[in-house]
Each structure stands twice: as structure tokens, then as C-alpha cells.
Swiss-Prot record:
Belongs to the short-chain dehydrogenases/reductases (SDR) family. NAD(+) binds at residues 9-33. The active site is at 155 (proton acceptor). Its EC number is 1.3.1.56. The keyword RNA-binding does not apply. This is Cis-2,3-dihydrobiphenyl-2,3-diol dehydrogenase. One of its GO terms (molecular function) is oxidoreductase activity, acting on NAD(P)H, oxygen as acceptor. GO terms for biological process: catabolic process.
Length: 276
């Protein structure tokens, strides 16, 4: 187990990618505190993992809730080795022209307060514990932090902001805390949209992402949640990633190497190599 006796705090760990990260960290030997807005999901986590998981109900837009999570994590587990700011919402790729004039202020505030401010507040609250443990932060970014059309201007702008946050905090917190980011691609989860745009009850799983991504990803299919979690384990380990801070891992199925005319360039490799 790569994370034996380590302690992590994950925001938005009650569902989706966050839940998969929690499950993987526990399997790797870690104890995990989870800050999530859903009491029901936290109860499910604790039922699944028992004393290895501590659930804290709260809002990632509120510093006091992050401080409570950090405080309760340290009280229960003695330390924080790794912080994973992960809670987020998606704007369902709504173009600027389609955002209603009377909702754009609220939509901007909602997306940026959850997807950017929520990350910054998490680091602020956990920083003393992370410095004490000489720990690390692993941000969840997105392919939208690097390429267009992974969201609308609200989501894409927010994820680009997180890229800048990784780099700045990697500088500011060195040499005491390592800061890195994982930019996963699409996956079918319960990721919701902004309430200000009437999308609070809409889940990304309602979009046929699997069909859409299979033809455009060089890896040939849409990854499932669990397949993204190894990158978080890698960045959280102390021995293998001691030299690594300020790193941004494009963990998206190869979006950056798609060809202009075809997503993949090696479909006929087995034939050329006479393997079939």
C-alpha cells in the first residue's frame, strides 16, 4: 500500500471523482477526511469505510467550514499529509451568448466561488497542518484548464485560474509543501451545474459522453472514474514525488495529441508489425 498511515482531506469526496479518490486512498492505506455538502453521501462513505473515513458536512465557499474540516481531521487522525481540493460544478458548456443577462453575475459568482475560491480556502485552512507534515496539495483541474470546449467560458475560465493557482502556490509554499494538479478528462459522474442557471439537478451523467469521446480520444474510449485516481496517489506519495512541485498532469486520454483528421495515428500498427 502506497499511502500507509497517511492522512488526506478531500473536498467534494462524497460522489463522482472525489468518491473514487477516497475509495482509492483508503485502499492504499490512508485515512481520509471528506468535506462535502451532502450528509447522506457522507453517511454512505462512512458506512463503506468505517473509522478510516471522517465525514464533515459543509460548504466549500465558506472558510469556516474548511477550518472546521481541517480541525476535525487533525483531531481525529492527528495530521493532514495531503489536501485534495476537488469539489466543483460544470456549466454544461453554455456559451457566453446563451447566458441570460439577468443571471450572468450570479452564475459567474457561483462557478468561481465553488471551483476557484473553494480551492483557495481549502489551502488556507489546511496550511498550518500541511506545513507541519511537510505535506502536499493535489488540485483537481480538468482538460478545460488547457483546451477550449471542455466547458463554457465560466467553467473553462475557472479551470484556467486553477492552473495559475497551482503554479503560484507551488512557489509560495516551497520548500514546505508540494503543490501539483491533475487534469482529468471526461467521465460519467453526478457532477452538477450551477443553480443560478437552473442546472442544480442536472448531472453530467445525463450527457452521452462515452459515445462522444470514444471517437475523439487517442486512447480509444472514455476512462471510468477509478482510472483517474492513480495520478492522485502518485502525487500524494512522499518517496516517488519528492522532486515534483508545480507539475500539471494532463490525464485526459490524450486530448493534446489528437490529429487533425483522425484522433489516433496508429490504428494499423498491428498489421504493419504483422501481429495479427
Amino acid at each position: 500500500m502506497q499511502l500507509n498511515n497517511e492522512v488526506a482531506l478531500v473536498t467534494g469526496g462524497g460522489s463522482g471523482l472525489g468518491r473514487a479518490i477516497v475509495d482509492r486512498f483508503v485502499a492504499e492505506g490512508a485515512r481520509v477526511a471528506v468535506l462535502d455538502k451532502s450528509a447522506a453521501r457522507l453517511q454512505e462513505l462512512q458506512a463503506a469505510h468505517g473509522a478510516k473515513v471522517l465525514g464533515i458536512e459543509g460548504d466549500v465557499r465558506v472558510l469556516a467550514d474548511h477550518q472546521k474540516a481541517a480541525r476535525e481531521c487533525v483531531a481525529a487522525f492527528g495530521k493532514i499529509d495531503c489536501l485534495i481540493p476537488n469539489a466543483g460544478i460544470w456549466d454544461y458548456s453554455m456559451p457566453l451568448v446563451d447566458i441570460p443577462d439577468d443571471r450572468i453575475d450570479a452564475a459567474f459568482d457561483e462557478v468561481f466561488h465553488i471551483n476557484v475560491k473553494g480551492y483557495l480556502l481549502a489551502v488556507k485552512a489546511c496550511l498550518p497542518a500541511l506545513v507541519q507534515s511537510r505535506g502536499s496539495v493535489v488540485f483537481t483541474i480538468s482538460n478545460a484548464g488547457f483546451y477550449p470546449n471542455g466547458g463554457g467560458p465560466l467553467y473553462t475560465g475557472a479551470k484556467h485560474a486553477v492552473v495559475g493557482m497551482v503554479r503560484e502556490l507551488a512557489y509560495e509554499l516551497a520548500p514546505h509543501v508540494r503543490v501539483n494538479g491533475v487534469a482529468p478528462g471526461g467521465m460519467s459522474t453526478d457532477l452538477r451545474g450551477p443553480a443560478s442557471l437552473g442546472m442544480a439537478n442536472q448531472a453530467i451523467s445525463s450527457v452521452p459522453l462515452g459515445e462522444m469521446l470514444t471517437s475523439v480520444l487517442p486512447v480509444g474510449r472514455m476512462p471510468v472514474r477509478a482510472e483517474y485516481t492513480g495520478a492522485y496517489v502518485f502525487f500524494a506519495t512522499r518517496g516517488d514525488t519528492f522532486p515534483t512541485t508545480g507539475a500539471l498532469l494532463n490525464h485526459d486520454g490524450g486530448m493534446g495529441v489528437r490529429g487533425f483528421f483522425e484522433a489516433t495515428g496508429g490504428k494499423d500498427l498491428p498489421q504493419k508489425l504483422r501481429l495479427s
